[in-house]
Amino acid sequence: MKLLAITSCPNGIAHTYMAAENLQKAADRLGVSIKVETQGGIGVENKLTEEEIREADAIIIAADRSVNKDRFIGKKLLSVGVQDGIRKPEELIQKALNGDIPVYRSATKSESGNHQEKKQNPIYRHLMNGVSFMVPFIVVGGLLIAVALTLGGEKTPKGLVIPDDSFWKTIEQIGSASFSFMIPILAGYIAYSIADKPGLVPGMIGGYIAATGSFYDSASGAGFLGGIIAGFLAGYAALWIKKLKVPKAIQPIMPIIIIPVFASLIVGLAFVFLIGAPVAQIFASLTVWLAGMKGSSSILLALILGAMISFDMGGPVNKVAFLFGSAMIGEGNYEIMGPIAVAICIPPIGLGIATFLGKRKFEASQREMGKAAFTMGLFGITEGAIPFAAQDPLRVIPSIMAGSMTGSVIAMIGNVGDRVAHGGPIVAVLGAVDHVLMFFIAVIAGSLVTALFVNVLKKDITASPVLSETAPTSAPSEAAAANEIKQPIQSQKAEMSEFKKLTDIISPELIEPNLSGETSDDIIDELIQKLSRRGALLSESGFKQAILNREQQGTTAIGMNIAIPHGKSEAVREPSVAFGIKRSGVDWNSLDGSEAKLIFMIAVPKESGGNQHLKILQMLSRKLMDDNYRERLLSVQTTEEAYKLLEEIE
């Protein structure tokens, strides 16, 4: 039986790839052929072809954002949230094997299909689709404004102010421009999720009107609440017009003229004459109330936000709190996102610390999992805690909620602010956090509370326990990729080269099973020489400078005895990877304290597409998350054995 699947989450960093990995592993265990297309932060990967869709027996979509299903009309289709793809992959595949899923007709014709959509909660899915496109605008705007204020701001009684004639004023204005797109993008892509392309224009127009109070005589706009209302109103108006029966002569112009024009008029006039002013008043009152919160009321809000963020670790409850904090950034209230930014990273960091402090409480594989979780927490990826919660929810979930609530309260009391819609120490390092010292105190305190709670609640492991197979540890790619995508992704078109697997860009000549270097610099030189002898480099010194520049930004040792030094340089002739093993290990300033033993060096030409190195990082880390695979790779003795194992990375 042949199955196909698509996975996608609002942010496209963690859940997308965890669900894909779990579906693939579950299919392997059940002896079923499956291909998984991922629609993540760097675009569509492993795209399903028309021939594959034609030959498939069933399709599984595990997504929390809108996925175009038109290509699956007439096929058996199971549509669920991405969390089900992570936690219940075998159950989903078993349903497909049993034929217990409906045939997809269209978004409007299939009753059973609509029933399936209701189970997935379409309102949440449409909302998260808008959020996923909105967040990059908040991140770009917040980072640019934070950098401009940090480097160009002058202290005044009103705080940091950038002089009008300063270069940094231009940077601040670019950041503000990014913020101005936030609500139109949110509304536009909510409508797009509901009505496809005909909903995009009316959604964006409605979002712009919602954000511009002058349309309805309001001093302030209707904010993100107005954007959400505009998105749903535009989407369902477009969908309603789309369903109207019209003469065949008019059908060709329906999606490009009739639907966008009339849906835009409906949402625009509704906001100007009916909705805009009342919603603006509600939003203004909410903003004033939040800004005026003091004492016990602000602590209560912090407790609620901390609990929501950690309760389902990237799920629907988490996303509602995250959306609230993100929206407040656009209104200039950074002290809501501050406690959220702290709460986001506490679950994975706290559990990583727990595995270090309570070694008798965790299996060796779980301790390795803890290292990966800790690393992911540094980059604000809450999902690193999911494997622990899946194995022991009754002890882990209360512990991480207690830690996140503690950290959020400390952050709220300390007036911690965050100008970027993201969390974890990475945002503090990038200068996006106000009151950095209190931020780190809150993170450390909350993480220690989580670690202590978990270790108090958990019993010592038995001599040789058998662990049930659950969701695997999240890929180190999320930590590596999060570090790489902290700058805005310029394009999701992802100019990828032809390589489909690692051995397309690595040859036996680029493998050294017994590295001789004693320091990280020695290892870098050794691998660069291999690349040079293979003809991959135009200049050894030029490429080494690119590698060292990258290391200065932060270590490329991602933990679990892995280092992935990489550089994009004019000194590189073609994309290549060199690999070496240092059996005794070498200090690489790893985030989890482990020495690097498996070293992959990535070389990419400067003029290549912006996502090539991210694709290679994902290829590597998806496989390297497998404890057994890393052990097998460390045990190879010859170049041939290593190359054969590397053939599995694709």
UniProtKB/Swiss-Prot annotation:
Consequence recorded when altering C9A: Appears to be unable to inactivate ManR, since ManR does not show any decrease in its DNA-binding activity in the presence of this mutant
Known role: The phosphoenolpyruvate-dependent sugar phosphotransferase system (sugar PTS), a major carbohydrate active -transport system, catalyzes the phosphorylation of incoming sugar substrates concomitantly with their translocation across the cell membrane. This system is involved in mannose transport.
Enzyme class: transferase
Claim: Cell membrane is one of the keywords in the record: yes
Stated induction or repression of this protein's expression: Up-regulated by mannose. Is under the control of ManR. Is subject to carbon catabolite repression (CCR) by glucose. Forms part of an operon with manA and yjdF.
Protein name, per record: PTS system mannose-specific EIIBCA component
UniProt modified residues of type Phosphoserine: S365
SUPFAM superfamilies: Phoshotransferase/anion transport protein, PTS system IIB component-like
Location of the protein in the cell: Cell membrane
An example Gene Ontology biological process: phosphoenolpyruvate-dependent sugar phosphotransferase system
Catalytic activity: D-mannose(out) + N(pros)-phospho-L-histidyl-[protein] = D-mannose 6-phosphate(in) + L-histidyl-[protein]
Span of domain PTS EIIC type-2: 123-456
Species: Bacillus subtilis (strain 168)
Alphabetized UniProt keyword annotations: Cell membrane, Kinase, Membrane, Phosphoprotein, Phosphotransferase system, Sugar transport, Transferase, Transmembrane, Transmembrane helix, Transport
Catalytic activity, EC: 2.7.1.191
TM region positions: 133-153, 174-194, 199-219, 221-241, 256-276, 297-317, 336-356, 369-389, 396-416, 436-456
Ranges where the PTS EIIA type-2 domain occurs: 504-649
Superkingdom as given in the UniProt entry: Bacteria
Annotated Gene Ontology cellular component terms: plasma membrane
GO molecular function, one term: kinase activity
Chain ranges of the PTS EIIB type-2 domain: 1-98
Classification via InterPro entries: Bacterial_PTS_Sugar_Transport (IPR050864), PTrfase/Anion_transptr (IPR016152), PTS_EIIA_type-2_dom (IPR002178), PTS_EIIB-like_sf (IPR036095), PTS_EIIB_2 (IPR013011), PTS_EIIB_2/3 (IPR003501), PTS_EIIC (IPR003352), PTS_EIIC_2 (IPR013014)
UniProt-listed NCBIfam families: FRU, fruA, PTS_IIC_fructo
Domain notes: The EIIB domain is phosphorylated by phospho-EIIA on a cysteinyl or histidyl residue, depending on the transported sugar. Then, it transfers the phosphoryl group to the sugar substrate concomitantly with the sugar uptake processed by the EIIC domain. The EIIB domain is also able to transfer its phosphoryl group to a specific histidine residue in ManR, which leads to its inactivation. The EIIC domain forms the PTS system translocation channel and contains the specific substrate-binding site.
Loss of function: phenotype: Cells lacking this gene are unable to grow with mannose as the sole carbon source. Deletion of manP results in constitutive expression from both the manP and manR promoters, indicating that the phosphotransferase system (PTS) component EII-Man has a negative effect on regulation of the mannose operon and manR.
Active site residues of this protein: C9, H566
A Pfam family the protein falls into: PTS_EIIC
